Amino acid sequence: MYYGFDIGGTKIALGAFDSTRRLQWEKRVPTPHTSYSAFLDAVCELVAEADQRFGVKGSVGIGIPGMPETEDGTLYAANVPAASGKPLRADLSARLDRDVRLDNDANCFALSEAWDDEFTQYPLVMGLILGTGVGGGLVLNGKPITGQSYITGEFGHMRLPVDALTLMGFDFPLRRCGCGQMGCIENYLSGRGFAWLYQHYYDQSLQAPEIIALWEQGDEQAHAHVERYLDLLAVCLGNILTIVDPDLLVIGGGLSNFTAITTQLAERLPRHLLPVARAPRIERARHGDAGGMRGAAFLHLTD
């Protein structure tokens, strides 16, 4: 059995998957906020319950936001303060007496999609998350590409390309990102960015679902906004795809539920790619909330 944990600031979710990559059992508990000991106990108790349920010693993979293992072997995860700064992988491996593998949650999302039955045919899979922020991951031949600092796929912190300023206007404001830099694309392409762009151009404060509802009703202003957003997304993706050249692009996050993104993006991409380049197949993520657990579990499929 393959056990996958999706750990965030509010919940620890465990999914148990069989050898055919099918979910057989899942359970969620609250994430301890202050006690590292309580955090370790919560994870270990879930593993013990799964081992007893299935009568085997399952493998353990964990997806968590942040940098799973820094140079000194400790976790950096601002949203999981009980475990941040602690040698989580080493401590869990010792307590559970097995090889525990960690990766960040965005890489686990990409890995989950790459191991979908329909998508395993594609050697290079790029996962793109358009949610509260913009992130993603890369999977090559079934294995995540992490980089030395676990930041491979942090597409949201690329800066706006010059073509974006040509599209939006050279007086377009470069917003300061939470990372400290100016003009990171997640400030414009995330769900928050989608809403900010609408407010910037129309001086109306609406959330992304409200704007999308107007678009679905045929509202001309919402239609113009979506066209502008899709053009900006295509411009920014053009740079990324020229570097990565994936076979498959899978889009997740809240905005992936907006069908215009997956259905209308492909026609916009070629003008931003090299003449010899082909746009990848573009699909919406298949596994929703279970994706984090799946990808974490499948860290042990990469041997």
UniProtKB/Swiss-Prot annotation:
Positions annotated to bind ATP: 4-11, 133-140
Top-rank lineage group of the source organism: Bacteria
Pathway(s) the chain acts in: Cell wall biogenesis; peptidoglycan recycling
InterPro entries recorded: ATPase_NBD, N-acetyl-D-glucosamine_kinase, ROK, ROK_cs
Binding site for Zn(2+): H157, C177, C179, C184
UniProt catalytic activity: N-acetyl-D-glucosamine + ATP = N-acetyl-D-glucosamine 6-phosphate + ADP + H(+)
Biological process (GO), any one: N-acetylglucosamine metabolic process
Pfam families, sorted: ROK (PF00480)
Name assigned to this protein: N-acetyl-D-glucosamine kinase
Species of the source: Salmonella paratyphi C (strain RKS4594)
Lineage of the species this protein comes from: Bacteria, Pseudomonadati, Pseudomonadota, Gammaproteobacteria, Enterobacterales
Encoding gene (name): nagK
